[in-house]
Regions:
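Phosphate-binding/switch loop-helix module in NTP-utilizing enzymes
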Residues: 154-200
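Residue-level signature of catalytic and energy-coupling elements of molecular machines
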Residues: 19, 54, 73, 84, ...
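A short amphipathic beta-strand at an alpha->beta junction
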Residues: 55-73
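Gly/Ala-rich phosphate-binding loop of Rossmann-like dinucleotide-binding domains
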Residues: 55, 100, 201
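Phosphate-binding loop that captures ATP/GTP phosphates
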Residues: 99-162, 168-170, 175
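Walker A/P-loop phosphate-binding motif and the immediately C-terminal alpha-helix
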Residues: 75-112, 227, 231
Length: 315
């Protein structure tokens, strides 16, 4: 049995199955493994197991482990709005969770650099991401997705006063992080049509955009501007979501429409885009979101509204 065969026999079964090459020279054992589909934690565990298995082998003074992986074909879905306060971040978080519930491998980028909301919405406040080889590793959540947000990188409550290029660089670090096997990245963009949006379009080229608006005319005017930005950037608009659509009184059951009804659907039809559905103005959605538990992770009509949206986006 050769030295290499002897060393191979010492490797854990998973490492043997993933082994690309193994070489012993001058006391250094160099192991190259296929880490396709593994996230950062799984790669770290495998590397530690290999080093432990070979460290005491005769003639081995040093163990070097290199990981190779096929870069996954990742689909970026940008979630935008022309106006703040329309529930875009809530829709982004719940869309990501709903896609994960449908069996997709999903990551969520909080690209609202100046006003990050995802740590609160996903219950990750106070949790900082790790880093590996100058790449950030997403913060895991209880809901089957990883998330990266400036809210996890700065002190809570601290204001960020950066010019456009710095915000664009920050976006790049979030998008180009170690997303492991994620096949879909949902990107929660800031409101408006500024530097971060332009950087997203020019450097990262989303596969499509979901536009969030309330039914009222003022919000729809700005939502139309957001759609025009994506069209100019040659990013397909997947469709328009009408948020805060219809309020059911918890006492009498009467349905009212404080922001109007049907405006987003009519605007989508006018512009030739798909209408992706309505999300109700529901106290339960607000309460769950403030508590860091996305309604899409639960059951009932609130969850079903987001699951229906995810089914339309996933097709």
């Amino acid at each position: 049995m050769s030295d290499n065969d002897a060393l191979k026999s010492l490797l854990p079964p998973l490492a043997q199955a993933r082994l690309q090459s193994l070489r012993l020279a001058d006391g250094a054992a160099t192991v190259i493994l296929d880490a396709s589909g593994f996230d950062g934690i799984e790669r770290d565990r495998l590397e530690a197991a290999v080093k432990e298995a070979l460290a005491a082998a005769p003639g081995v003074r040093e163990v070097r482990v290199a990981m190779m992986a096929d870069k996954p074909k990742r689909r970026i879905i940008a979630v935008g709005s022309g106006k703040g306060g329309v529930g875009k971040s809530t829709v982004s978080a719940n869309l990501a969770v709903a896609l994960a519930r449908l069996g997709r491998k999903v990551g969520l980028v909080d690209a609202d650099i100046y006003g990050p909301s995802q740590p609160r919405l996903l219950g990750t406040e106070g949790k900082r991401p790790d880093a590996r080889e100058k790449q950030l590793i997403p913060v895991p959540t209880e809901f089957g997705i990883g998330v990266l947000s400036m809210g996890n990188l700065i002190e809570p409550g601290k204001a960020i006063a950066w010019r456009g290029p710095m915000a664009g660089n920050a976006l790049g670090q979030l998008v180009d992080a170690d997303w492991g096997a994620a096949e879909i990245l949902v990107v929660d963009l800031p409101p408006g049509t500024g530097d971060v949006q332009l950087t997203m379009l020019q450097r990262h080229k989303p596969a499509g955009a979901v536009i969030v608006s309330t039914p009222q005319d003022l919000a729809l005017i700005d939502a139309t501007r957001a759609m025009q930005l994506f069209e100019v950037g040659q990013v397909p608009v997947i469709g328009l979501v009408e948020n805060m659509a219809g309020y059911v009184c918890p006492h009498c059951g009467e349905v009212s429409d404080p922001f109007g009804r049907g405006g987003a659907e009519a605007e989508a039809a006018r512009l030739g885009h798909a209408f992706l559905g309505r999300i109700p103005l529901d106290m339960a959605i607000r309460q769950a979101s403030d508590a860091g538990v996305p309604p899409a992770a639960g059951e009932g009509p609130q969850a079903e509204a987001f699951l229906a949206l995810a089914r339309r986006v996933a097709t």
